[in-house]
Amino acid sequence: ATYLSYLPKEDFRYPLRVNSDSRGKFVEILQTSHSGQFSFFTADPGITRGGHYHHTKNEKFIVLRGKAKFRFYNLLTGETYEIVTDDQFIEAVGTCRGWAHDITNVGNDELIVALWANEIFDPEAPDTIAKPFRDLRLRL
């Protein structure tokens, strides 16, 4: 905190890298060595993001704007679970290891979701394994 108080005013703000594709934007806000990574993403109506699972990573999502459907699929048992939430009821939705998950914008406006992950993404040892729900023959 003392160090930060001596930063020049020009360093009070700084640009963030925006990763954009057809699904929307993904922005990493902050990476920490002990507290994980903080990010947010966007999705237009009808767009699904995710479609993967993790071996070690835990994630928490908060819908800041819009309405989202979270779908989960247990890789061992085949059990499915679904949560629909929106910006009118602020709650955290967590993922669990061994469950594939995706998030769909089921509202009429842009979806904005804040995301915390317990560990920083490591391109040398990625822990995001693609498992699109269309490959699981789900009836969701």
Predicted features and spans:
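Intrinsic-disorder/low-complexity, polar/charged segments enriched in Ser/Thr/Lys/Arg/Asp/Glu/Gln
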Residues: 36-38, 48, 67, 80, ...
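C-terminal substrate-binding subdomain of Rossmann-fold SDR/epimerase-dehydratase oxidoreductases
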Residues: 1-25, 135-140
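Double-stranded beta-helix
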Residues: 77, 100, 104-140
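A short glycine-rich, His/Asp/Glu-containing loop-to-beta-strand
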Residues: 12-51, 57
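Short acidic-glycine-tyrosine-enriched beta hairpin
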Residues: 74-98, 102-104, 112
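Residue-level "contact hotspot" at macromolecular interaction interfaces
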Residues: 42, 62, 92-94
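Short histidine-centered beta-strand/loop micro-motifs
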Residues: 28-29, 49-55, 62, 83-85, ...
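Glycine- and acidic-residue-biased ligand/ion/polar-headgroup-sensing regions
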Residues: 56-75
